[in-house]
Structures are given as C-alpha cells and as structure tokens.
Design a protein with these regions (language model features):
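Juxtamembrane loop-transmembrane helix junctions in multi-pass integral membrane proteins
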Residues: 12-22, 90-97, 117, 121, ...
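Individual transmembrane alpha-helices with interfacial aromatic-anchor signatures
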Residues: 158-175
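Short, Lys/Arg-rich, polar N-terminal cytosolic tail immediately upstream
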Residues: 1-16
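Interfacial segments of alpha-helical transmembrane regions
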Residues: 17-35, 121-133
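Core segments of transmembrane alpha-helices
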Residues: 105-107
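Conserved small/polar residues in nucleotide/adenosyl-binding loops
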Residues: 178-184
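Juxtamembrane helix-break-helix junctions at the cytosolic face
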Residues: 110-125
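Solvent-exposed, well-ordered loop and adjacent helix/strand elements within mature globular domains
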Residues: 33-102, 135-152
C-alpha cells in the first residue's frame, strides 16, 4: 500500500511539474494577445488621448510631450468624441506620435515574451522589459492625480479609492508578479 501511495504521489508531482511549463507558456500566449492588442490600440486617437494624464504627469515620460502637464486638462476628450481644436492641440503636443511609438514598444515586448516558448534568452529579455514597463506603469499611482477618486464633496475620495484609471494601473501588479517569477 505504501509503495502504491508513493508511486501515486510521484506521478502527481511529475504531472504538476509538467503542467507548470504549460501554464507558463499559456501565460506567454496571453501576454502576446494582450500586449499586441493594447499596443495596436495606441494607434487609435482615443487611446492616445486617454493616456495623456499618465504621460504628462510622469517625470520619466513627460518630456515626450511638448505641452506642460496641467494644460492637458482643457483638451481632454471623451472616448469617441471629436473636437477639431482639441485634436489639433494633441497633434501639437505629440500625443499621437508618442502613442504610436509606445504601441510599437508594447507589441514588441509581447512578441519577445511569447518567443520565450522557443528561446529562453529571448523570453528573459521580454520578461525583463515587461518588468521595466510595469514598474513605469505602477509609478502612475504616485504621479497621476486622476488615479484616485477626487474630492468633489463626497466623503469617498483619495487613497485607497481608485478611479477607473487607477484600477487600470493597479492590475499590472499581477503582470509584474508573473514576469518576476518567469524571469527565474
């Protein structure tokens, strides 16, 4: 009986070890899909306009824009909205040019991470870039006022109450944890 239990236990451990590699590879596929999709969206004006508060307030990225941080608030557009004057401001700000470059970078990171299925060295480079990008994204929790519910008269505002933008940012902690583990 003891030998059968030991054999069963060893078989279970062997199966678990083999599924770990499958699980890591499935996560790589998921990162490819997500990063190529999000990177591709950076070529649409609404997405480029949507990241302006993050980039404009970041001490690490604001130099990509030509306008100062508080100015963007006057030129915000709702998703799907078009206003020629506001659009022109975004053209002059390099909103679209920066977003296109960021989109290419995000897609490349997704592809490198996916290629880790076939080449561990390439996958490690992709994972390292995901970590760097995710740390930059998480820095928005400190630099971007729009990630916290504003004080508009309610008692429900500030830390730890995240806005939609804040919730978008905080979910990157899961990506950071995966890639930190996958980089081992």
């Amino acid at each position: 009986m003891k030998t059968k239990l030991q054999n069963l236990f060893m078989a279970a451990l062997t199966l678990a070890a083999s599924t770990q590699k499958l699980g890591v590879n499935l996560i790589r596929v998921a990162i490819l899909v997500i990063f190529v999709w999000i990177g591709g969206l950076k070529f649409w004006n609404y997405e480029a306009e949507g990241i302006v508060p993050f980039v404009a307030n970041s001490p690490f990225m604001s130099f990509f824009y030509t306008k100062s941080a508080p100015e963007y608030k006057e030129y915000k557009l709702k998703e799907g909205e078009f206003n020629e004057a506001k659009h022109q401001w975004h053209v002059e700000n390099n909103t679209y040019g920066f977003s296109h470059g960021l989109g290419i970078l995000i897609m490349a990171i997704g592809i490198l991470t996916f290629l880790g299925i076939f080449s561990p060295k390439i996958g490690l480079a992709g994972a390292a870039l995901v970590i760097v990008m995710t740390m930059g994204t998480l820095s928005f929790l400190v630099t971007t006022p729009e990630v916290w519910v504003p004080d508009l008269g309610s008692e429900e505002h500030g830390f730890p109450l995240l806005t939609g933008a804040g919730r978008l940012v905080i979910k990157d902690t899961a990506c950071l944890l995966y890639t930190s583990d996958a980089a081992d």
